[in-house]
A protein has these predicted regions:
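HIT superfamily nucleotide-processing domains
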Residues: 2-172
Length: 172
């Protein structure tokens, strides 16, 4: 279903975990709220203070399918919560992820960088990982050094695709 430029899932409210939380039908640990958005502590955190920010209105989990205004409003709400975490948890930064694979309701996940020095330092994990296909989760671990010829081929694929789409848009 499309509402404006935004896809709205037909899994409306009755079966949506986040809609039930917004309605107060499921318990949550609310840390911030305004008229349109809600932020709760994640009950499955991998770091203290991990937070989920969600719109109160049920929207498809693909953040980049939103209209520019909807995405901007959502990012502003996410930023407000990130700033709250920075201040209250006394952290240098908060990292944000839009994945939306587990729950089909638009949301961002915030990860307070507890223990990160306020001075910028290069931190590289010793382990490397690479996936041929998306494994249904996100990691920021680096992979092995990609081959230049593979990167060049991928660059041509992406740039060529973009140019073809621009030409198609201009012909419509």
């Amino acid at each position: 279903m499309v509402l404006g430029n935004t896809r709205v899932s037909l899994m409306i409210e009755d079966n949506c975990l986040f809609c039930m939380i917004v309605k107060g039908q499921l318990p949550s640990y609310k840390i911030w709220e305004d008229e349109n958005y809600l932020a709760i502590l994640d009950i499955f955190p991998n770091i203290k203070g991990q937070t989920v920010v969600m719109p109160k209105k049920h929207l498809d989990s693909d953040a980049f399918a939103l209209s520019d205004k909807e995405l901007t409003d959502f990012m502003i709400a996410t930023k407000k919560v990130a700033n709250l975490l920075v201040t209250r948890l006394d952290v240098a930064r908060v990292h944000v992820v839009f994945e939306g694979m587990h729950t089909d309701h638009l949301h961002s996940k915030l990860y307070p960088a507890i223990g990160l020095s306020r001075e910028t330092k290069q931190a590289i994990a010793p382990e490397k990982i690479y996936f041929e296909e998306y494994p249904s989760y996100v990691t920021t671990l680096e992979g092995p050094r990609a081959k230049d010829e593979d990167l060049k081929r991928l660059q041509v694929t992406i740039v060529g695709f973009r140019k073809r789409n621009k030409n198609k848009e201009n012909s419509d």
